[in-house]
């Protein structure tokens, strides 16, 4: 069984749009790889700019920092460079003018204690 590690990247645009993106990968060192940190921030910025309706739509979109690649292709490039399988698990995009977050509806997050027990067991 493979252990999954998660990393949440944040991005804010002019204090009016906020994004949190949860990434999943197999190696704990991936979270500190410069290539991963750049692509995770860029994907969060992409979500802020284009407001995709769900992860599937996000991955199919032309990447905002280089339209010759899709978001999925850019993530695959980064995965090769960090030698790990990196995927976007879920995200939330919040607009300050709105009372509601714009997000796909994933399962609710686990209680912090349950998540901590899972990571300690792995």
Name every feature range the model reports, one short phrase each.
Residues 1-122:
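N-terminal assembly/interaction segments in proteins that build large macromolecular machines
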């Amino acid at each position: 069984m493979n252990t999954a590690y998660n990393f949440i990247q944040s991005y804010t645009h002019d204090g009016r749009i906020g994004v949190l993106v949860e990434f999943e990968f197999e190696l704990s060192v991936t979270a500190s790889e410069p290539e991963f940190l750049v692509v995770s921030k860029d994907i969060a910025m992409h979500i802020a700019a284009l407001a995709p309706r769900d992860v599937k739509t996000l991955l199919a979109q032309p990447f905002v920092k280089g339209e010759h690649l899709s978001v999925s292709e850019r993530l695959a490039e980064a995965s090769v460079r960090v030698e790990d399988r990196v995927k976007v698990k879920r995200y939330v995009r919040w607009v300050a003018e709105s009372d509601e977050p714009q997000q796909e509806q994933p399962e609710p997050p686990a209680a912090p204690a349950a998540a901590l027990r899972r990571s300690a067991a792995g």
